[in-house]
Design a protein with these regions (language model features):
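Tubulin/FtsZ superfamily GTPase core signature
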Residues: 1-371
Length: 371
């Protein structure tokens, strides 16, 4: 008798360095399903705090478990020294996410090594990383750009989130911790927005082959997330997704687009059509647009749209100038382009099957409390 085959795509999320491991911890905390989590770090103490399925301390001889000292060369060498161990934990994956906060040591230097191994094993390899805040200094910025360039060469698709864009989200009174929490939620939404397309049954289903057709060898990519309620909710959610202040580049000219629309059982066909048309018009005329829709009654009257745009001419999207923070229009309180962070007085609602997300935050050393 032929043994049963596992037809589910094997998805692994690798967080490397302090920022990457923090991102993985956040995904575990909210209950992201259908993936295996791997935490890699040169800081043995910080690694002990992770709840990842697999924890790998690299550079044991090189750093003695004390971290890379914000030196990407140390991070790279540490990962290279444990290349066989990294390969072993990545074996069998169909898709590998590599996430880190660019600009430091372990993540910046080690992420390209991890991506290189994953891609050689035949996995669709997607990088989701952050560019550091300007206040973190010139050296960190320079290291981040070099790390991003190197990681782009090793990934099928690379999504970069600039932390400075968090400052354009509107509220000048937001606390430092809430800003970082928002960034964690965006990163979560980025990874989950892709994995849900594969792992969550939908009204219009997508599978791993659909995602791969857009993201394999696509180079730089953009992701947008939007949600809205009310009469024009689907179109407003789509508009929010393609014009998110977290996107520093325009999706004009994208030749590959993944589009996911989620709503309650009252989600209408014409709503879906109007939202999809809006996204289609923003992409390249000959774009390969892969579309999925899911019914999730937990969303109530809310519609959520996730857009991933890739495959740009020249390999990178066109630059979009930053816009100053705008005051919230109190007459239109239903539209949002970023995930909402629950207030301390309000317990977080259970994570719905179709929530979307996207960003890893590079926490400054003075906020790490020695971790």
């Amino acid at each position: 008798m032929t043994p049963p085959h596992n037809y589910l795509a094997v998805i692994k999320v690798v967080g490397i360095g302090g920022g990457g491991v923090n991102a993985v911890n956040r995904m575990i905390e909210v209950g992201l399903k259908g993936v295996e989590f791997i935490a890699i770090n040169t800081d043995a103490q910080a690694l002990l705090m992770s709840d990842a399925d697999v924890k790998l301390d690299v550079g044991r001889e090189l750093t003695r478990g004390l971290g890379a000292g914000a030196n990407p060369d140390v991070g790279k060498n540490a990962a290279e020294d444990h290349r066989d161990e990294i390969e072993e934990v990545l074996k069998g994956a169909d898709m590998v996410f590599v996430t880190c906060g660019e600009g430091g040591g372990t993540g910046t230097g080690g992420a390209p090594v991890v991506a290189n191994i994953a891609r050689k094993l035949g996995a669709l390899t997607i990088g989701v990383v952050t560019r550091p805040f300007s206040f973190e200094g010139k050296r960190r910025q320079v290291q981040a750009e070099a790390g991003i360039d190197e990681l782009r060469n090793q990934c099928d698709t690379l999504i970069v989130i600039p932390n400075d864009r968090l400052l354009a989200l509107g509220d000048r009174n937001i606390s430092m911790m809430d800003a970082f929490r928002t960034a964690d939620q965006v990163l979560l939404s980025g990874v989950q927005g892709i994995t849900d397309l594969i792992t969550t049954p939908g009204l219009i289903n997508l599978d791993f082959a659909d995602v791969k057709s857009v993201m394999s060898g696509a180079g730089s990519a953009l992701m947008g997330i939007g949600s809205a309620r009310g009469e024009n909710r689907a179109v407003e959610a789509a508009e929010a997704a393609i014009s998110s202040p977290l996107l520093e580049q325009s999706m004009d000219g994208a030749r590959g687009v993944l589009l996911s629309i989620a709503g309650g059982s009252d989600l209408g066909l014409f709503e879906i059509n109007d939202a999809a048309q809006l996204v289609t018009d923003a992409a390249h005329p000959d774009a390969n647009i892969i579309f999925g829709a899911v019914i999730d009654d937990a969303l109530g009257d809310e519609v959520r749209v996730t857009v991933i745009a890739a495959g740009f001419d020249g390999g990178t999207p066109a630059y979009k100038a930053a816009e100053p923070a705008r005051k919230t229009n109190q007459n239109q309180p239903t539209q949002s382009s970023t995930p909402v962070v629950p207030s301390p007085a309000t317990p977080a609602a259970p994570q719905s099957p179709r929530r979307v997300l996207f960003d890893d935050v590079d926490v400054p050393d003075f906020l790490k409390n020695g971790s």
